[in-house]
Protein backbone atom coordinates (compact mmCIF):
# COMPACT_ATOMS: atom_id res chain seq x y z
CA UNK A 1 0.00 0.00 0.00
CA UNK A 2 1.24 3.49 -0.85
CA UNK A 3 -0.47 5.64 1.74
CA UNK A 4 -0.07 8.94 -0.09
CA UNK A 5 -2.38 7.74 -2.86
CA UNK A 6 -4.66 5.54 -0.78
CA UNK A 7 -8.35 6.15 -1.38
CA UNK A 8 -9.40 3.96 1.55
CA UNK A 9 -7.07 3.54 4.51
CA UNK A 10 -6.80 -0.07 5.63
CA UNK A 11 -6.17 -1.58 9.02
CA UNK A 12 -2.85 -3.29 9.70
CA UNK A 13 -3.43 -6.57 11.53
CA UNK A 14 -1.02 -9.45 11.91
CA UNK A 15 1.34 -7.96 9.35
CA UNK A 16 -1.35 -7.64 6.66
CA UNK A 17 -3.24 -4.65 5.29
CA UNK A 18 -6.90 -5.60 5.64
CA UNK A 19 -10.23 -3.90 5.08
CA UNK A 20 -12.35 -3.14 8.11
CA UNK A 21 -15.39 -5.21 8.94
CA UNK A 22 -17.28 -1.92 8.99
CA UNK A 23 -18.60 -0.27 5.85
CA UNK A 24 -18.84 3.11 7.59
CA UNK A 25 -16.27 5.64 6.43
CA UNK A 26 -15.14 9.11 7.44
CA UNK A 27 -13.41 11.57 5.14
CA UNK A 28 -9.82 12.60 5.78
CA UNK A 29 -9.27 16.24 4.80
CA UNK A 30 -6.32 18.42 3.95
CA UNK A 31 -7.16 21.23 6.42
CA UNK A 32 -5.33 23.83 4.33
CA UNK A 33 -7.58 23.27 1.32
CA UNK A 34 -10.64 21.45 2.60
CA UNK A 35 -10.06 18.72 0.00
CA UNK A 36 -10.76 15.06 0.79
CA UNK A 37 -7.51 13.11 0.58
CA UNK A 38 -8.67 9.68 1.80
CA UNK A 39 -11.44 7.74 3.48
CA UNK A 40 -10.82 6.07 6.83
CA UNK A 41 -12.96 3.20 8.14
CA UNK A 42 -14.82 3.54 11.42
CA UNK A 43 -13.80 0.08 12.55
CA UNK A 44 -15.73 -2.11 14.96
CA UNK A 45 -14.98 -4.09 18.09
CA UNK A 46 -14.69 -7.05 15.74
CA UNK A 47 -11.70 -5.39 14.10
CA UNK A 48 -10.22 -4.76 17.54
CA UNK A 49 -10.72 -8.44 18.39
CA UNK A 50 -8.74 -9.49 15.33
CA UNK A 51 -5.90 -7.09 16.11
CA UNK A 52 -5.70 -8.02 19.79
CA UNK A 53 -5.64 -11.74 18.99
CA UNK A 54 -2.86 -11.15 16.45
CA UNK A 55 -0.91 -9.11 18.99
CA UNK A 56 -1.44 -11.72 21.69
CA UNK A 57 -0.19 -14.49 19.42
CA UNK A 58 2.87 -12.43 18.44
CA UNK A 59 3.59 -11.75 22.12
CA UNK A 60 4.41 -15.41 22.69
CA UNK A 61 7.55 -15.19 20.56
CA UNK A 62 8.32 -11.46 20.70
CA UNK A 63 8.48 -11.43 24.50
CA UNK A 64 11.09 -14.20 24.28
CA UNK A 65 13.12 -12.46 21.57
CA UNK A 66 16.55 -11.48 22.84
CA UNK A 67 16.59 -7.88 24.04
CA UNK A 68 19.58 -6.91 21.83
CA UNK A 69 17.75 -8.25 18.78
CA UNK A 70 14.70 -6.12 19.59
CA UNK A 71 17.02 -3.13 19.94
CA UNK A 72 18.69 -3.80 16.58
CA UNK A 73 15.31 -3.77 14.83
CA UNK A 74 14.55 -0.40 16.43
CA UNK A 75 17.94 0.99 15.41
CA UNK A 76 17.18 -0.02 11.83
CA UNK A 77 13.73 1.52 12.17
CA UNK A 78 15.26 4.76 13.41
CA UNK A 79 17.51 4.88 10.34
CA UNK A 80 14.57 4.29 8.01
CA UNK A 81 12.74 7.21 9.62
CA UNK A 82 15.82 9.37 9.04
CA UNK A 83 16.04 8.23 5.41
CA UNK A 84 12.37 9.09 4.81
CA UNK A 85 12.06 12.27 6.88
CA UNK A 86 11.10 14.53 3.96
CA UNK A 87 8.22 12.27 2.94
CA UNK A 88 7.07 11.97 6.55
CA UNK A 89 7.17 15.74 7.12
CA UNK A 90 5.19 16.39 3.95
CA UNK A 91 2.59 13.81 4.92
CA UNK A 92 2.19 15.41 8.35
CA UNK A 93 1.65 18.81 6.74
CA UNK A 94 -0.89 17.46 4.25
CA UNK A 95 -3.13 15.70 6.79
CA UNK A 96 -2.52 17.86 9.88
CA UNK A 97 -1.93 21.31 8.37
CA UNK A 98 1.10 22.44 10.37
CA UNK A 99 3.93 24.14 8.53
CA UNK A 100 6.56 21.99 6.83
CA UNK A 101 9.24 23.30 9.19
CA UNK A 102 7.15 22.33 12.21
CA UNK A 103 6.40 18.95 10.66
CA UNK A 104 10.13 18.43 10.20
CA UNK A 105 10.62 19.24 13.88
CA UNK A 106 7.97 16.68 14.77
CA UNK A 107 9.72 14.04 12.67
CA UNK A 108 12.95 14.75 14.55
CA UNK A 109 11.20 14.37 17.91
CA UNK A 110 9.68 11.10 16.77
CA UNK A 111 13.09 9.84 15.72
CA UNK A 112 14.50 10.85 19.12
CA UNK A 113 11.79 8.75 20.79
CA UNK A 114 12.77 5.72 18.72
CA UNK A 115 16.44 6.30 19.57
CA UNK A 116 15.55 6.29 23.26
CA UNK A 117 13.47 3.14 22.84
CA UNK A 118 16.37 1.39 21.11
CA UNK A 119 18.44 2.03 24.24
CA UNK A 120 15.69 0.98 26.64
CA UNK A 121 17.22 -2.45 27.32
CA UNK A 122 19.73 -0.69 29.55
CA UNK A 123 16.83 0.64 31.63
CA UNK A 124 15.19 -2.80 31.74
CA UNK A 125 18.00 -4.33 33.75
CA UNK A 126 17.03 -5.66 37.14
CA UNK A 127 18.68 -5.28 40.53
CA UNK A 128 20.30 -7.74 42.89
CA UNK A 129 21.44 -7.86 46.49
CA UNK A 130 23.69 -10.82 47.24
CA UNK A 131 23.26 -10.97 51.03
CA UNK A 132 19.85 -10.03 52.38
CA UNK A 133 20.57 -12.62 55.08
CA UNK A 134 23.23 -15.23 55.63
CA UNK A 135 23.37 -17.35 52.49
CA UNK A 136 20.29 -15.69 50.96
CA UNK A 137 20.20 -13.40 47.93
CA UNK A 138 17.40 -11.49 46.19
CA UNK A 139 17.01 -10.15 42.69
CA UNK A 140 14.44 -8.15 40.72
CA UNK A 141 13.77 -8.91 37.05
CA UNK A 142 11.68 -6.98 34.54
CA UNK A 143 9.26 -8.61 32.11
CA UNK A 144 6.85 -7.31 29.45
CA UNK A 145 3.18 -7.25 30.39
CA UNK A 146 1.47 -8.29 27.14
CA UNK A 147 -0.73 -6.51 24.61
CA UNK A 148 -0.73 -2.70 24.89
CA UNK A 149 -3.37 -0.38 23.43
CA UNK A 150 -2.36 3.08 22.24
CA UNK A 151 -4.80 5.88 21.39
CA UNK A 152 -3.20 8.92 19.75
CA UNK A 153 -4.35 12.44 18.77
CA UNK A 154 -4.34 14.35 15.49
CA UNK A 155 -1.97 17.12 16.54
CA UNK A 156 1.22 15.04 16.61
CA UNK A 157 0.52 12.12 14.25
CA UNK A 158 4.15 10.97 14.31
CA UNK A 159 5.65 12.03 17.62
CA UNK A 160 2.96 10.63 19.92
CA UNK A 161 2.78 7.17 18.31
CA UNK A 162 6.58 7.15 18.49
CA UNK A 163 6.30 7.91 22.23
CA UNK A 164 4.26 4.78 22.61
CA UNK A 165 4.83 1.72 20.48
CA UNK A 166 8.65 1.76 20.05
CA UNK A 167 9.23 1.82 23.81
CA UNK A 168 6.47 -0.72 24.44
CA UNK A 169 7.84 -3.19 21.91
CA UNK A 170 11.43 -2.58 23.05
CA UNK A 171 10.27 -3.82 26.45
CA UNK A 172 8.92 -6.99 24.81
CA UNK A 173 5.23 -6.10 24.50
CA UNK A 174 3.06 -6.11 21.40
CA UNK A 175 0.91 -3.16 20.39
CA UNK A 176 -2.47 -2.19 18.93
CA UNK A 177 -2.52 1.45 17.82
CA UNK A 178 -5.64 3.52 17.20
CA UNK A 179 -4.48 6.72 15.50
CA UNK A 180 -6.74 9.73 15.19
CA UNK A 181 -9.27 9.21 12.44
CA UNK A 182 -8.34 12.71 11.29
CA UNK A 183 -4.70 11.81 10.63
CA UNK A 184 -4.44 8.08 9.80
CA UNK A 185 -2.01 8.27 6.88
CA UNK A 186 1.15 8.97 8.85
CA UNK A 187 0.45 6.06 11.20
CA UNK A 188 0.11 3.74 8.22
CA UNK A 189 3.46 4.88 6.88
CA UNK A 190 5.06 4.28 10.28
CA UNK A 191 3.79 0.69 10.14
CA UNK A 192 5.16 0.19 6.63
CA UNK A 193 8.61 1.32 7.73
CA UNK A 194 8.46 -0.83 10.87
CA UNK A 195 7.77 -3.85 8.69
CA UNK A 196 10.68 -2.89 6.45
CA UNK A 197 12.90 -2.71 9.54
CA UNK A 198 12.12 -6.35 10.26
CA UNK A 199 9.46 -6.07 12.94
CA UNK A 200 7.68 -9.45 13.05
CA UNK A 201 4.04 -9.78 12.08
CA UNK A 202 1.57 -8.95 14.82
CA UNK A 203 3.98 -7.00 17.01
CA UNK A 204 2.50 -3.70 15.76
CA UNK A 205 -1.12 -3.50 14.64
CA UNK A 206 -3.26 -0.53 13.60
CA UNK A 207 -7.05 -0.31 13.87
CA UNK A 208 -8.57 2.89 12.49
CA UNK A 209 -11.78 4.32 13.81
CA UNK A 210 -13.39 6.24 16.64
CA UNK A 211 -15.47 5.38 19.73
CA UNK A 212 -16.00 1.68 19.02
CA UNK A 213 -12.28 1.08 18.67
CA UNK A 214 -11.50 2.99 21.87
CA UNK A 215 -14.10 1.03 23.82
CA UNK A 216 -12.97 -2.21 22.24
CA UNK A 217 -9.45 -1.66 23.55
CA UNK A 218 -10.66 -0.53 26.97
CA UNK A 219 -12.89 -3.59 27.39
CA UNK A 220 -10.75 -6.37 25.94
CA UNK A 221 -9.37 -8.70 28.61
CA UNK A 222 -6.17 -9.42 26.67
CA UNK A 223 -5.23 -5.72 26.56
CA UNK A 224 -3.15 -5.20 29.68
CA UNK A 225 -2.43 -1.47 29.47
CA UNK A 226 -3.65 1.66 27.69
CA UNK A 227 -1.62 4.72 26.76
CA UNK A 228 -3.71 7.72 25.70
CA UNK A 229 -3.10 11.29 24.57
CA UNK A 230 -6.02 13.60 23.81
CA UNK A 231 -8.63 15.94 25.24
CA UNK A 232 -9.42 16.16 28.96
CA UNK A 233 -12.96 14.69 28.86
CA UNK A 234 -11.84 11.68 26.83
CA UNK A 235 -8.70 11.21 28.94
CA UNK A 236 -10.81 11.07 32.09
CA UNK A 237 -13.19 8.60 30.42
CA UNK A 238 -10.31 6.40 29.24
CA UNK A 239 -8.74 6.39 32.69
CA UNK A 240 -11.97 5.53 34.50
CA UNK A 241 -13.11 2.84 32.08
CA UNK A 242 -9.64 1.37 31.69
CA UNK A 243 -9.01 1.08 35.41
CA UNK A 244 -12.51 -0.31 35.96
CA UNK A 245 -11.41 -3.09 33.62
CA UNK A 246 -8.24 -3.60 35.69
CA UNK A 247 -5.81 -2.16 33.15
CA UNK A 248 -2.82 0.05 33.65
CA UNK A 249 -3.65 3.46 32.21
CA UNK A 250 -1.69 6.59 31.46
CA UNK A 251 -3.94 9.29 30.03
CA UNK A 252 -2.42 12.61 28.97
CA UNK A 253 -5.10 15.27 28.79
CA UNK A 254 -5.70 18.98 28.13
CA UNK A 255 -3.75 22.05 29.17
CA UNK A 256 -3.89 25.76 29.83
CA UNK A 257 -0.23 26.70 30.08
CA UNK A 258 0.76 29.95 31.77
CA UNK A 259 3.80 32.07 30.93
CA UNK A 260 4.88 34.57 33.59
CA UNK A 261 6.79 37.67 32.47
CA UNK A 262 8.49 39.69 35.22
CA UNK A 263 9.80 43.24 35.15
CA UNK A 264 13.42 42.13 34.74
CA UNK A 265 12.68 39.86 31.77
CA UNK A 266 14.42 40.20 28.44
CA UNK A 267 11.35 41.36 26.50
CA UNK A 268 12.83 40.61 23.10
CA UNK A 269 13.48 37.01 24.13
CA UNK A 270 10.13 36.67 25.91
CA UNK A 271 8.24 38.00 22.89
CA UNK A 272 9.96 35.63 20.49
CA UNK A 273 9.38 32.62 22.72
CA UNK A 274 5.74 33.44 23.48
CA UNK A 275 4.84 34.03 19.82
CA UNK A 276 6.32 30.68 18.84
CA UNK A 277 4.76 28.84 21.80
CA UNK A 278 1.31 30.39 21.38
CA UNK A 279 0.90 30.23 17.61
CA UNK A 280 3.12 27.35 16.52
CA UNK A 281 1.12 24.35 15.28
CA UNK A 282 -1.89 26.72 15.23
CA UNK A 283 -1.99 26.45 19.02
CA UNK A 284 -3.04 22.81 18.68
CA UNK A 285 -0.63 21.32 21.17
CA UNK A 286 -0.84 20.53 24.86
CA UNK A 287 2.29 22.60 25.56
CA UNK A 288 1.06 25.74 23.79
CA UNK A 289 1.34 29.03 25.65
CA UNK A 290 -2.26 30.12 26.07
CA UNK A 291 -2.05 32.58 28.99
CA UNK A 292 0.57 35.24 29.71
CA UNK A 293 0.60 36.83 33.16
CA UNK A 294 2.73 39.96 33.05
CA UNK A 295 3.66 42.52 35.69
CA UNK A 296 1.78 45.76 35.16
CA UNK A 297 4.84 47.99 34.74
CA UNK A 298 5.88 46.29 31.50
CA UNK A 299 2.49 45.05 30.29
CA UNK A 300 1.97 47.77 27.67
CA UNK A 301 5.43 47.16 26.21
CA UNK A 302 4.93 43.41 26.02
CA UNK A 303 1.47 43.66 24.45
CA UNK A 304 2.77 46.08 21.83
CA UNK A 305 5.66 43.75 20.99
CA UNK A 306 3.43 40.68 20.80
CA UNK A 307 0.96 42.37 18.46
CA UNK A 308 3.78 43.67 16.28
CA UNK A 309 5.31 40.20 15.93
CA UNK A 310 1.93 38.50 15.43
CA UNK A 311 1.25 40.86 12.53
CA UNK A 312 4.38 39.52 10.80
CA UNK A 313 3.24 35.89 10.90
CA UNK A 314 2.69 34.34 7.48
CA UNK A 315 -0.55 32.35 7.39
CA UNK A 316 -1.29 29.72 4.77
CA UNK A 317 -0.72 26.24 3.41
CA UNK A 318 2.10 24.66 5.38
CA UNK A 319 3.77 23.43 2.19
CA UNK A 320 4.25 27.02 0.99
CA UNK A 321 7.54 28.72 1.70
CA UNK A 322 7.75 31.05 4.72
CA UNK A 323 4.39 29.94 6.15
CA UNK A 324 4.46 29.76 9.96
CA UNK A 325 0.78 29.42 10.87
CA UNK A 326 -1.26 26.73 9.18
CA UNK A 327 -4.94 25.88 9.62
CA UNK A 328 -6.71 24.27 12.55
CA UNK A 329 -7.69 20.68 11.95
CA UNK A 330 -11.36 20.97 10.88
CA UNK A 331 -14.03 23.51 10.01
CA UNK A 332 -15.99 22.77 13.20
CA UNK A 333 -12.86 23.53 15.23
CA UNK A 334 -12.48 26.81 13.35
CA UNK A 335 -16.07 27.72 14.22
CA UNK A 336 -15.51 26.68 17.85
CA UNK A 337 -12.44 28.93 18.02
CA UNK A 338 -14.32 31.88 16.56
CA UNK A 339 -16.99 31.24 19.20
CA UNK A 340 -14.36 31.59 21.92
CA UNK A 341 -13.09 34.83 20.38
CA UNK A 342 -16.66 36.14 20.36
CA UNK A 343 -17.07 35.16 24.01
CA UNK A 344 -13.86 36.96 24.98
CA UNK A 345 -15.20 40.17 23.48
CA UNK A 346 -18.61 39.68 25.10
CA UNK A 347 -17.06 39.09 28.54
CA UNK A 348 -15.04 42.29 28.41
CA UNK A 349 -11.51 41.33 27.35
CA UNK A 350 -9.68 43.76 25.07
CA UNK A 351 -9.15 42.24 21.63
CA UNK A 352 -5.83 43.71 20.49
CA UNK A 353 -5.34 41.39 17.52
CA UNK A 354 -8.33 39.82 15.81
CA UNK A 355 -7.49 36.58 14.02
CA UNK A 356 -10.96 36.47 12.51
CA UNK A 357 -9.99 39.30 10.15
CA UNK A 358 -6.95 37.77 8.47
CA UNK A 359 -7.32 37.26 4.72
CA UNK A 360 -6.63 33.51 4.91
CA UNK A 361 -9.62 33.04 7.22
CA UNK A 362 -11.99 34.05 4.44
CA UNK A 363 -10.65 31.58 1.85
CA UNK A 364 -10.50 27.82 1.53
CA UNK A 365 -9.23 25.75 4.41
CA UNK A 366 -9.75 26.04 8.14
CA UNK A 367 -7.69 29.07 9.09
CA UNK A 368 -7.79 31.27 12.18
CA UNK A 369 -5.24 34.05 12.47
CA UNK A 370 -3.17 34.78 15.58
CA UNK A 371 -5.51 36.29 18.17
CA UNK A 372 -4.44 38.23 21.26
CA UNK A 373 -6.63 39.38 24.16
CA UNK A 374 -5.47 41.85 26.83
CA UNK A 375 -7.03 42.55 30.26
CA UNK A 376 -8.25 38.96 30.60
CA UNK A 377 -9.57 37.78 33.98
CA UNK A 378 -9.95 34.29 35.39
CA UNK A 379 -13.74 34.54 35.23
CA UNK A 380 -13.64 34.50 31.42
CA UNK A 381 -14.08 31.36 29.34
CA UNK A 382 -10.98 32.19 27.31
CA UNK A 383 -8.96 31.89 30.55
CA UNK A 384 -10.72 28.82 31.89
CA UNK A 385 -11.05 26.52 28.87
CA UNK A 386 -8.54 24.82 26.64
CA UNK A 387 -9.25 26.44 23.27
CA UNK A 388 -6.57 24.49 21.36
CA UNK A 389 -6.15 27.20 18.76
CA UNK A 390 -4.03 30.32 18.09
CA UNK A 391 -5.63 32.41 20.84
CA UNK A 392 -3.48 34.08 23.52
CA UNK A 393 -4.84 35.67 26.71
CA UNK A 394 -2.90 38.31 28.65
CA UNK A 395 -3.52 38.82 32.37
CA UNK A 396 -1.96 41.82 34.14
CA UNK A 397 -0.67 41.21 37.67
CA UNK A 398 1.07 43.19 40.40
CA UNK A 399 3.62 40.57 41.46
CA UNK A 400 5.06 37.10 40.99
CA UNK A 401 2.98 35.94 43.94
CA UNK A 402 -0.21 36.97 42.16
CA UNK A 403 0.91 35.42 38.88
CA UNK A 404 1.58 32.07 40.56
CA UNK A 405 -1.70 32.23 42.47
CA UNK A 406 -3.64 32.78 39.24
CA UNK A 407 -1.82 30.00 37.39
CA UNK A 408 -2.44 27.58 40.25
CA UNK A 409 -6.19 28.22 40.08
CA UNK A 410 -6.34 26.56 36.67
CA UNK A 411 -7.51 22.96 36.74
CA UNK A 412 -4.91 22.17 34.09
CA UNK A 413 -1.22 21.82 34.91
CA UNK A 414 0.82 20.56 32.00
CA UNK A 415 3.42 23.30 31.66
CA UNK A 416 4.36 26.76 32.91
CA UNK A 417 7.14 29.20 32.02
CA UNK A 418 8.79 32.19 33.62
CA UNK A 419 10.79 34.96 31.97
CA UNK A 420 13.23 36.58 34.39
CA UNK A 421 16.91 37.03 35.21
CA UNK A 422 16.31 36.53 38.94
CA UNK A 423 17.45 33.27 40.49
CA UNK A 424 15.30 33.95 43.55
CA UNK A 425 12.22 34.36 41.35
CA UNK A 426 13.02 31.15 39.49
CA UNK A 427 13.37 29.28 42.77
CA UNK A 428 10.03 30.62 44.05
CA UNK A 429 8.41 29.71 40.74
CA UNK A 430 9.87 26.20 40.78
CA UNK A 431 8.82 25.49 44.34
CA UNK A 432 5.29 26.95 44.31
CA UNK A 433 3.87 26.57 40.79
CA UNK A 434 1.51 23.60 40.46
CA UNK A 435 2.57 22.25 37.10
CA UNK A 436 4.53 19.28 35.84
CA UNK A 437 6.85 20.77 33.19
CA UNK A 438 8.53 24.11 33.79
CA UNK A 439 10.49 26.47 31.61
CA UNK A 440 12.84 29.33 32.47
CA UNK A 441 13.16 31.71 29.51
CA UNK A 442 11.91 28.79 27.38
CA UNK A 443 8.49 28.91 25.72
CA UNK A 444 7.74 25.21 25.27
CA UNK A 445 9.38 23.20 28.09
CA UNK A 446 8.57 19.80 26.61
CA UNK A 447 11.21 17.31 27.79
CA UNK A 448 13.28 14.98 25.65
CA UNK A 449 12.24 11.33 25.41
CA UNK A 450 14.55 10.21 28.22
CA UNK A 451 12.58 12.35 30.71
CA UNK A 452 8.90 11.79 31.62
CA UNK A 453 6.19 13.99 30.11
CA UNK A 454 4.82 14.89 33.50
CA UNK A 455 1.55 16.81 33.57
CA UNK A 456 -0.37 17.40 36.82
CA UNK A 457 -4.03 17.88 37.86
CA UNK A 458 -6.53 17.48 35.02
CA UNK A 459 -3.71 17.36 32.50
CA UNK A 460 -2.87 13.78 33.45
CA UNK A 461 -4.63 10.71 34.80
CA UNK A 462 -2.50 7.85 36.04
CA UNK A 463 0.62 7.15 38.06
CA UNK A 464 3.38 6.59 35.50
CA UNK A 465 3.96 9.21 32.82
CA UNK A 466 4.92 8.70 29.19
CA UNK A 467 8.61 8.49 28.25
CA UNK A 468 11.76 8.15 30.31
CA UNK A 469 12.10 5.67 33.13
CA UNK A 470 8.37 6.14 33.83
CA UNK A 471 7.69 4.69 30.39
CA UNK A 472 9.82 1.62 31.06
CA UNK A 473 8.06 1.14 34.41
CA UNK A 474 4.68 1.44 32.70
CA UNK A 475 5.45 -1.16 30.04
CA UNK A 476 7.05 -3.75 32.35
CA UNK A 477 6.23 -5.79 35.42
CA UNK A 478 8.60 -7.17 38.04
CA UNK A 479 9.49 -10.55 39.45
CA UNK A 480 11.41 -10.95 42.68
CA UNK A 481 13.59 -14.02 43.12
CA UNK A 482 14.93 -14.91 46.56
CA UNK A 483 17.38 -17.81 46.77
CA UNK A 484 19.14 -19.73 49.51
CA UNK A 485 22.46 -21.33 48.67
CA UNK A 486 24.18 -23.30 51.38
CA UNK A 487 27.58 -24.93 51.24
Swiss-Prot record:
Biological-process GO terms, alphabetical: inositol catabolic process; thymine catabolic process; valine catabolic process
Tell me the enzyme class. Answer: oxidoreductase
Q: In which pathway does it act?
A: Polyol metabolism; myo-inositol degradation into acetyl-CoA; acetyl-CoA from myo-inositol: step 7/7
What keywords are assigned to this protein?
NAD, Oxidoreductase
Positions of NAD(+) binding: 154, 178, 181-182, 231, 386
| Known EC number | 1.2.1.27
Tell me the first and last residues of the signal peptide.
none
Molecular function, one GO term: malonate-semialdehyde dehydrogenase (acetylating) activity
Q: Which Pfam families match?
A: Aldedh
Question: What are the positions of the active site?
Answer: 286
The record ties this protein, via InterPro entries, to:
Ald_DH/histidinol_DH, Ald_DH_C, Ald_DH_CS_CYS, Ald_DH_N, Aldehyde_DH_dom, MeMal-semiAld_DH, MSDH_GmP_bac
Catalyses: 3-oxopropanoate + NAD(+) + CoA + H2O = hydrogencarbonate + acetyl-CoA + NADH + H(+); 2-methyl-3-oxopropanoate + NAD(+) + CoA + H2O = propanoyl-CoA + hydrogencarbonate + NADH + H(+)
Q: Spell out the Gene3D superfamilies in the cross-references.
A: Aldehyde Dehydrogenase, Chain A, domain 1, Aldehyde Dehydrogenase, Chain A, domain 2
Origin, by domain of life? Bacteria
Question: What role is this protein assigned?
Answer: Catalyzes the oxidation of malonate semialdehyde (MSA) and methylmalonate semialdehyde (MMSA) into acetyl-CoA and propanoyl-CoA, respectively. Is involved in a myo-inositol catabolic pathway. Bicarbonate, and not CO2, is the end-product of the enzymatic reaction.
**UniProt family annotation:** Belongs to the aldehyde dehydrogenase family. IolA subfamily.
Quaternary structure, per UniProt, is: Homotetramer.
HAMAP family associated with the record: IolA
The record's section on PANTHER family has: MALONATE-SEMIALDEHYDE DEHYDROGENASE (PTHR43866:SF4)
Q: What is this protein called?
A: Malonate-semialdehyde dehydrogenase 2
Q: What organism, scientifically named, is this protein from? A: Bacillus thuringiensis (strain Al Hakam)
Q: Which gene encodes it?
A: iolA2
